[in-house]
UniProtKB/Swiss-Prot annotation:
Keywords: ATP-binding, Cell membrane, Membrane, Nucleotide-binding, Translocase, Transport. GO terms for molecular function: ABC-type polyamine transporter activity; ATP binding; ATP hydrolysis activity. The keyword Lipid metabolism does not apply. The complex is composed of two ATP-binding proteins (PotA), two transmembrane proteins (PotB and PotC) and a solute-binding protein (PotD). Part of the ABC transporter complex PotABCD involved in spermidine/putrescine import. Responsible for energy coupling to the transport system. Belongs to the ABC transporter superfamily. Spermidine/putrescine importer (TC 3.A.1.11.1) family. Residues 105-177 are annotated as: Insert. It is an enzyme of class 7 (translocase). SMART domains: AAA. It is found in: Cell membrane. This is Spermidine/putrescine import ATP-binding protein PotA. It is a peripheral membrane protein. ATP binds at G37, P38, S39, G40, C41, G42, K43, T44.
């Protein structure tokens, strides 16, 4: 996939407070990218800068290799769906979706081509005139002058005929108001069908549910066929079931439309369900960029491990390649490249720990609490050094003495930032 957007050394200062600290990010064409992080981490600020609603304090925003910082928001090939949708309460569903098309000049490309043709015609005519005068200056003989003049007039006549024919053909392609309205009707009904809003065309915004309002906002944003769609936590006001349905719908829309989506959320499930690439942020800085699988299975640091899913976070010491020491024991692992005796952070996911009979595992502990979570049990096991959180489908007795075990690949070693 081609790179569509590049953010280079982006910073933003609000009221003497540094909100963005040197953001560097590449977004590819037809990619679903999610900015994931806690409130105030700077993710919405990035969205607003891309959309043209804010300017960075320093840095560059490149779109297809060209800076767009001086391009007005409405002229960028980017549309935004805001958290509160920003729908027009005085317009019905149909007119909300049609709003962008009604502002659009359907003949703009034809007008541009007419201007291009005219410029080309004038330039060619001027070049012919220049050549004509140069030839006259070289040869002032009567017969030659007449021949040069006739040749010039013939070229000008041919050039003019070609220009007028092209202009006439382009003008014939212009559409009138009736044809424009027919196109609007066709496009609006198409996107209303895509978003599952058939039968609601004449309803006011107040008569819609939260999920329906969100669909209207997305249809309105998509109908102008932007190259990029920015979504600022659009699912935050929906109930759980509807939110899950919309996650799958959004991914399908993105995949089928070929539009690049940049989605902002603090919800890990949203990010992992929909994204090709997740950008984890904290305190105005990018902590890690990767696929949902990479972010979850190989967190770059303690913050990512804590923010993305539940974790057992442990401080340890790297003894050698593939050997790490924690909880008074040395364990085999799959990590290498650290200095000997380097202090490290370790994460072991709750689902990667198994409970076994005493004497059969790596660490002994006592079952301290058991909570049923629907698809698994969440069990706290207190050991001599710490309490481990374990997710398992096997039920164990409270206060029972057991062992826990895990594999070398389940131990994720991280640098301390």
């Amino acid at each position: 996939m081609k790179t569509l957007i590049i953010l280079k050394d982006l910073t933003k200062v609000f009221d003497n407070q540094l909100i963005l600290r040197g953001i560097n990010l590449e977004i590819k064409q037809n990619e679903f990218v999610t900015l994931l992080g806690p409130s105030g981490c700077g993710k919405t600020t990035i969205l607003r800068i891309l959309g043209g609603f804010e300017n960075p304090s320093s840095g560059e925003v490149l779109f297809q290799g060209k800076s767009i910082l001086n391009v007005a928001a409405h002229k960028r090939p980017i549309n935004t769906v805001f958290q509160k949708y920003a729908l027009f309460p005085h317009l019905n569903v149909f007119e909300n979706v049609a709003f962008g098309l009604r502002l659009k000049d359907f003949n703009s490309k034809i007008k541009d081509n007419l201007d291009i043709n005219e410029t080309h015609y004038k330039t060619s005519k001027a070049n012919l005139s220049k050549t004509f005068h140069q030839e006259l200056t070289k040869d002032l003989a009567q017969e030659k002058t007449t021949q040069i003049t006739n040749n010039f007039n013939n070229q000008i006549e041919a050039l003019t005929k070609d220009f007028e024919a092209k202009q006439t053909a382009l003008k014939c392609k212009k559409i009138n108001k009736k044809e424009q309205e027919e196109q609007i009707q066709k496009e609006v009904l198409k996107y209303i069908k895509i978003m599952g809003l058939q039968g609601l065309e004449k309803r006011t915004i107040e008569q819609l549910s939260g999920g329906q309002q969100q669909r209207v906002a997305i249809a309105r944003a998509l109908i102008n066929k932007p190259q990029v769609l920015l979504l600022d936590e659009p699912l935050s006001n929906l109930d759980l079931k509807l939110k899950q349905e919309m996650q799958y719908e959004l991914k399908e829309i993105q995949k089928n439309s070929g539009i690049t989506f940049l989605f902002v959320t603090h919800d890990q499930e949203e990010a992992f369900t929909m994204s090709d690439k997740v950008v984890v942020m904290n305190n105005g800085e990018i902590q890690q960029i990767g696929s949902p699988e990479d972010i979850y299975n190989e967190p770059a640091n303690r913050f990512v491990a804590q923010f993305v899913g539940e974790s057992n976070l442990i401080k340890g010491v790297m003894k050698d390649d593939f050997l790490v020491h924690f909880d008074n024991q040395t364990f085999n692992c799959v990590d290498k490249g650290f200095r000997k005796e380097e202090n490290v952070d370790i994460v072991i996911r709750p689902e990667d720990i198994d409970i076994v009979y005493q004497g059969k595992g790596l660490i002994t502990g006592i079952v301290q609490s058991i909570i049923f979570k629907g698809v698994h049990w969440e069990i706290d096991v207190k050991t001599a050094q710490r309490t481990y959180i374990i997710h398992t489908t096997d039920h164990v007795e409270l206060n029972k003495k057991i062992d826990i075990t895990f594999n070398p690949e389940d131990i994720h070693v991280m640098e301390i930032w």
